[in-house]
Amino acid sequence: ILMTAKTAASHFTGLEIQEEVAKMASRSVMLNHLGDKVSIICGDLKNTKTLFGKGVFNVVTVNPPYMAGGSGLVGADYSKAVSRHEILCSLEDVIRESANVLVAGGRMYMVHRPYRLGDIICLMKQYKMSPRRLCMVHPKASQEANLVLIEGIRGGNTQIRVEAPLVLFDEDGQESRQIKMIHGRLLSLIHI
């Protein structure tokens, strides 16, 4: 929903495998009067060829499950487990299918955990995507990064730019200056 305010794209399509989560997303779209700009589809990421075809999107944003299959403690809440663990899709599925639906030169934006960065880059190269930009996200400047933001380009060259780290909070636990600036820009885009 925030992306509709931030970009000039004419339409956004969301894909969600969990029916209840897809219904919640659809309700948010309707409550925000964005039905003409946003479509939510309940479907399996591994079926993008059937759902969409090949080379149909300019941009794909993904927030895949962070935990590799068979690792970490899987909680009792199935919906949360599917969101956090590679139960219904793997990192390879996400990157392969993203590459499939992107036009040549299209961009994929992903948020993931830094410990998976090696896998992400290898899989991007395997599926003819080039990592273009990378940003490590730190909870505080004194703490290790716990997220990585990565942009890939389908068929792009191999030059990668590592951007300055994004720090979320200062040492007192207050929003960092970077985050306040980002929130300010986002709020200026939203028309209430």
Label each region the model flagged.
Residues 1-10:
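Conserved SAM-binding loop of SAM-dependent methyltransferases across substrates and taxa
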Residues 11-16:
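Conserved SAM-binding motif I beta-strand of class I
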Residues 18-20:
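Conserved SAM/SAH-binding beta-strand->alpha-helix loop
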Residues 22-26, 117:
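Short alpha-helix immediately C-terminal to the canonical SAM-binding loop
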Residues 26-54:
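S-adenosyl-L-methionine
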Residues 55, 64-93:
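Mobile active-site "lid"/loop adjacent to the S-adenosyl-L-methionine
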Residues 88-145, 149:
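Conserved Class I SAM-dependent methyltransferase catalytic core
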Residues 190-192:
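Conserved small/polar residues in nucleotide/adenosyl-binding loops
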